[in-house]
Amino acid sequence: MDCRVVVEAAVPVYDVQSTDEAVRIAISKTGEMLNPDLNYVEIEMGSRSCPHCGTDTEPAFVAADESLVALELSMTVFNVERDEHAARIARKEIGQRLANIPLAVLEVDTVTDDDTQESTGGDTETA
């Protein structure tokens, strides 16, 4: 079984003035830490919402020129027996490269053969 695992990372960024700047720097910083070993990990802005009213908020919180940015890192883990196994592998692989950055598994989805072929651009038709 193959699984797509999405992990949330809380990336600290220093000397920033705006949330947009913080997000750009956090994505760049995370990409540098993951590459070239884990260039197959997709990096996206995290989605945050207010715990009280549920409204969407910025993925970065800026105070005193420092920021904490929520990023979502996703990767496909191949040949696992259970979802928990896929989550552990993803946390270990990503966590080794992102030292001192908190990680939390957001979701684990089973990947079907159709999903794999669509994401890799495979063609199922035969001539």
Curated annotation (Swiss-Prot):
It comes from the Archaea. Signal peptide: none annotated. Pfam families: DUF555. Belongs to the UPF0212 family. This is UPF0212 protein VNG_1264C. It comes from Halobacterium salinarum (strain ATCC 700922 / JCM 11081 / NRC-1). The lineage of its organism: Archaea, Methanobacteriati, Methanobacteriota, Stenosarchaea group, Halobacteria.
